[in-house]
């Protein structure tokens, strides 16, 4: 079965968001900076989404630098090109910090059920 990933417009769910989430072809939601005021609000939003459809994939494009949608109360991850520059002179160090950065991102997102 094919599933759709949708987005929502604001900081909370409105009736039209709820109806779209309930649609059987919706399998995921991608969140953006516009959906995050602070960590507490974001957690409430995720809880409200999970109440509608528990097994929904909730995603975010959050890899560091300007591609870090959630900023306040999240670790500031440098842009990935920094790791590439380090890699040119010290491959082992670059791999280590890239892996650690990935773990930080994963832990912070998992902590809020993403």
Q: Could you say what each language-model-derived stretch is?
A:
Residues 1-14:
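Boundary/entry segment of secreted carbohydrate-active catalytic domains
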Residues 25-114:
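Enzymes and membrane/adaptor proteins characterized by extended Gly/Ser/Thr/Asp/Glu-rich
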């Amino acid at each position: 079965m094919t599933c759709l990933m949708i987005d929502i417009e604001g900081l909370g769910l409105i009736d039209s968001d709820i109806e779209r989430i309930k649609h059987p072809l919706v399998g995921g939601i991608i969140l953006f900076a516009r959906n995050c005021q602070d960590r507490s609000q974001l957690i409430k939003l995720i809880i409200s989404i999970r109440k509608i459809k528990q097994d929904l994939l909730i995603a975010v494009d959050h890899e560091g630098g300007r591609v870090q949608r959630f900023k306040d109360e999240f670790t500031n991850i440098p842009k990935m090109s920094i790791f590439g520059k380090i890699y040119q002179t010290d491959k082992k160090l670059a791999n280590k910090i890239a892996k650690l950065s990935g773990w930080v991102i994963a832990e912070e997102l998992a902590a809020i059920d993403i």
